[in-house]
UniProtKB/Swiss-Prot annotation:
Gene3D superfamilies: 3.100.10.10
GO molecular function: RNA binding; structural constituent of ribosome
Annotated GO biological process: translation
NCBIfam families: PRK04005.1
Subunit structure: Part of the 50S ribosomal subunit.
Protein name as it appears in the record: Large ribosomal subunit protein eL18
Family (UniProt): Belongs to the eukaryotic ribosomal protein eL18 family.
Length: 121
């Protein structure tokens, strides 16, 4: 049996630690859930296309993706998307639609309680 080590990326480990700390400080479980989802192996981490974000959101929604946002599809309304990584095409399409592509840390600062945030995988 191989010992489970978790992510080796130092920045990701720091983010997971910060998410857990914020969860305990604020008494909110959403950040602990996001930390758990980011801790999974890379092959099991979320990869969400722009088309899926467009399909399941409406104008003004806030979405968090515990993984990567990819650029397939079109975005037809403004949304705020927070994710671990964005492809160049995805970031460009979100900004062209009038939305924002931000980091998970930035979303934690803006909305410490995590209210109204949609988790998308």
């Amino acid at each position: 049996m191989v010992k489970r080590t978790g992510p080796t990326d130092i920045n990701l480990r720091r983010l997971i630690r910060t998410l857990r700390k914020k969860s305990n400080e604020e008494g909110v479980k959403i950040w602990k859930d996001i930390a758990w989802r980011l801790e999974r192996p890379r092959r099991q981490r979320a990869e969400v296309n722009i088309s899926k974000i467009n399909r399941y959101t409406k104008e003004g929604d806030v979405v968090i993706v515990p993984g990567s946002v990819l650029g397939a599809g079109r975005l037809e309304h403004k949304v705020v998307v927070a994710a671990w990584k964005f492809s160049e095409a995805a970031r460009r399409k979100i900004i062209e639609a009038g939305g924002e592509a931000i980091s998970i840390e930035e979303l934690m600062e803006r909305n410490p309680k995590g209210s109204g945030v949609i988790i998308m995988e």
